[in-house]
Amino acid sequence: MALKIRLARGGSKKRPYYHVVLADARSPRDGRFLENLGSWNPMLAKDDEKRVQLNAERIKHWLDNGAQPTDRVLRFLNEAGVAKREAKNNPIKAKPGKRAQERAAEKAQKAADAAAAADAAE
């Protein structure tokens, strides 16, 4: 059984509230879970201490027993000092796409042609 530490949504419409739960990876997002490990209230201010509440002792226990946190939960665990989140580095993502590079090359070519025409006219 693959275990995940993930968020289960609660609250009402447009007023989200999430429980940090340990669940089987195959169960639905808000479905059956094994243990409630904390909560996250995104409606509170970012510096509010009650915004993210975690049971660090139980989370460490489950991480040691093979549970995998989701990306968002891993961010919370990294902030709390419970688990280490590796920074992702994707230098290719910052590069413009193929079409954008073609448009930039065309624009540079037109500017060079215009400069050459202006020099020839003088």
Curated annotation (Swiss-Prot):
Keywords: Ribonucleoprotein, Ribosomal protein. Residues 111-122 have a biased composition (Low complexity). One of its GO terms (cellular component) is small ribosomal subunit. Pfam families: Ribosomal_S16. PANTHER family: 30S RIBOSOMAL PROTEIN S16, SMALL RIBOSOMAL SUBUNIT PROTEIN BS16M. NCBIfam families: S16. Belongs to the bacterial ribosomal protein bS16 family. This is Small ribosomal subunit protein bS16. It comes from Rhizobium etli (strain ATCC 51251 / DSM 11541 / JCM 21823 / NBRC 15573 / CFN 42). The lineage of its organism: Bacteria, Pseudomonadati, Pseudomonadota, Alphaproteobacteria, Hyphomicrobiales.
